[in-house]
Amino acid sequence: MLNFLKKNSDNQEKTERCFDSSKPVADHIAVIMDGNGRWAQKRMLPRIAGHKEGMNNVKVITKHASKLGVKVLTLYAFSTENWKRPTDEVNFLMKLPVDFFDVFVPELIEENVRVNVMGYKEFLPAHTQKAVENAMEQTKENTGLILNFALNYGSRAEILTAVNDIVALAKSGDLPDEVDEKTFSSHLMTASLGEALQDPDLLIRTSGEERISNFLLWQIAYSELFFTDKYWPDFTTTDLEEAIGSYQLRNRRFGGLKDTTEGDA
Ligand code: V07
């Protein structure tokens, strides 16, 4: 009897969490694409095979997000901490933007996707920088989904860069006495997305970890968080719809008002 009740309530929860095409989708979705190495190890493959599979999934999820009407997809591709990984793995990762450019950019152009890259690009190898520049240049006229890669990105470093930029402005006498949220945000890397799209509505992390790991700390102040045990290469378009469905359900609890105060008393 108890089991029956439990099953019933699980089913109900699943139905409620379903994507609803009549409700607004999350405009800006950020993803921590975790679990590529573990996906490979589970299959007795080298970790780099997981990264390659993860890259293929970027294309699949981007296309589906674009179809659903998502405006920005921000993907954590390489963190400032990832340099500590074995040299061979880092070298392989640094080639992925090149591969991605060759294999997927023509398809994404057809899909009207614009590629943007934020992060400390100047520290990337020359061939990676070139691929990034090409991807951004060749898609700059596109007006559809913005595929925003965080590459050599770290949120604390981003915040400190913003502080230092503001200090430099203040020294040159170019700043009002007080810095407000809007001014501060305009110095963050997400400012390149345009004023309305800087903060993610929904943050997804795959692979079972429930941490933020130095990703968009300022920008996720009001974001809904969605964690799944699936490894990134196994994360499907249905999983994306489930994450958006969960966002739509939680958003509905605020009565359709854009809530910017903590707690929902
Ligand atoms: C990377 C594939 C996705 C899973 C997570 C880590 C590995 C796409 C890019 C990329 C970046 C910039 C760009 C075009 C493509 C990428 C890295 C790793 C370093 F302009 N996937 N992907 N870059 N992975």
For the regions a language model picked out, list residue spans one by one.
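Flexible, compositionally biased loop and terminal segments
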Residues: 1-265
